[in-house]
Design a protein with these regions (language model features):
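Low-complexity, polar-biased intrinsically disordered regions enriched in Pro/Ser/Thr/Gly
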Residues: 111-125, 187, 224-233, 258-273
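Generic detector of well-ordered alpha-helical segments enriched in charged/polar residues
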Residues: 165-172, 176, 218, 273, ...
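Intrinsically disordered, low-complexity Ser/Thr/Pro-rich tracts
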Residues: 1-132, 173-176, 183-185, 201, ...
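Signature of long, low-cysteine stretches enriched in small and polar/charged residues
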Residues: 178-245, 251-260
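Residues at structural and domain junctions
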Residues: 5, 9, 234, 288-295
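A short acidic-to-branched-hydrophobic micro-motif
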Residues: 123-188, 249-251, 258-259
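Intrinsic-disorder-associated interaction segments
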Residues: 33-37, 41-46, 50, 67, ...
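Surface-exposed amphipathic alpha-helical segments
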Residues: 252-313
Length: 313
């Protein structure tokens, strides 16, 4: 109950006491209260005075302070995505990568129109429109293959080519399972389709890029039995974006310190044919034993270029 209400009640009690005392007095010209009435009146007056004093001394109510305003938390600062030293960033359409400066003098790109030759055509004669990136002044001038990166739309390729569909499924299976050991004659998935056969692989390794993953390896394609040499081998990367929207094929000439530039024809060609499988297995093992820096360009540099690749949304 509030103090003002208490004061009012006490004053009312005092008035009632006085009235009660007055009822006991005789009607005379001079009213003289008895001792009980006087004591009651004094008590009521004292309580009223105490209540008034307490009300005066009570501190005035104060409002609770408003909570201090807090500044919104700032988002974390992201590290700037800049090319590594010694590389140059290239962006063509929605494809981006950082090329080591010593790999080539210049980089070009073009949109290759779709080639639709029908279901009976050779697989290499069928492909959707795709982005082709080529290199001028490549570090290895004498090679059978031309350096190129191709970026293909997966859905468009699958719509027109069953061999491409099979290749994407094989590649995806490899990327999901990532076997620890890959046989030299595994016949790894590879695009573009050439009119020749993959005779071996070496230095196979799964490498992720910023928008997906893939497998890189060394290989050589041939239409006949022929020794492995630097002129014919190449480095390739076969990758899929994480959303399976794009396929990336990289074909780059490469040299190994363990191989001749141009192999000589075997002295006994028939014996070479009969032992060709053993020869390829031994060649693959020899290349697998080579350090990454024993190749030109080095496997370390090429892996870093792969890791820098990005499909821009």
């Amino acid at each position: 109950m509030k103090k003002s209400e208490s004061t009012w009640i006490l004053a009312s009690i005092a008035l009632l006491v006085l009235c009660a005392a007055a009822c006991k007095l005789p009607f005379s010209s001079t009213a003289v209260p008895d001792d009980a009435a006087t004591a009651a009146l004094q008590l009521a007056q004292t309580q009223v005075g105490i209540s008034a004093t307490q009300t005066a001394l009570a501190p005035a109510p104060t409002e609770a302070p408003a909570p201090a305003a807090t500044e919104p938390a700032l988002p974390p600062t992201l590290e700037p995505d800049t090319p590594a030293p010694g590389t140059t960033r290239y962006t063509f359409g929605n494809f981006q990568f950082d090329m080591p400066d010593y790999l080539a003098l210049d980089v070009n790109h073009t949109i290759v129109p779709a080639a639709l030759e029908g279901d009976e055509a050779f697989p290499g004669a069928i492909q959707p429109e795709y982005l082709s990136i080529t290199f001028d002044g490549y570090i290895i001038p004498d090679a059978f293959h031309s350096p190129e990166i191709g970026v293909y739309p997966v859905a468009d390729y699958m719509e027109i080519s069953q061999p491409a569909t099979d290749t994407f499924e094989e590649l995806n299976y490899l990327l999901v399972n990532r076997p620890q050991t890959i046989p030299y004659d595994a016949g790894l998935p590879f695009i573009p389709f050439w009119n020749a056969g993959q005779i071996f692989n070496a230095q196979a390794k799964f490498v992720d890029f910023k928008s997906g993953s893939g497998i890189r390896f060394l290989s050589m394609y041939a239409q006949a039995v022929y020794p492995v040499d630097n002129y014919n081998i190449f480095f390739t990367y076969q990758g899929l974006s994480a959303d399976h929207a794009y396929f990336i094929s990289m074909v780059l000439p490469i040299n190994s310190a363990a191989l001749p530039m141009h192999a000589e024809d075997p002295a006994d060609y028939e014996a070479f044919i009969n032992s060709f499988s053993t020869y390829l297995q031994e060649t693959s093992a020899m290349l697998n034993a080579e350090a990454p820096e024993r190749f030109t360009p080095t496997l370390t540099v090429l892996d870093a270029m792969i890791a820098s690749m990005r499909i821009i949304p």
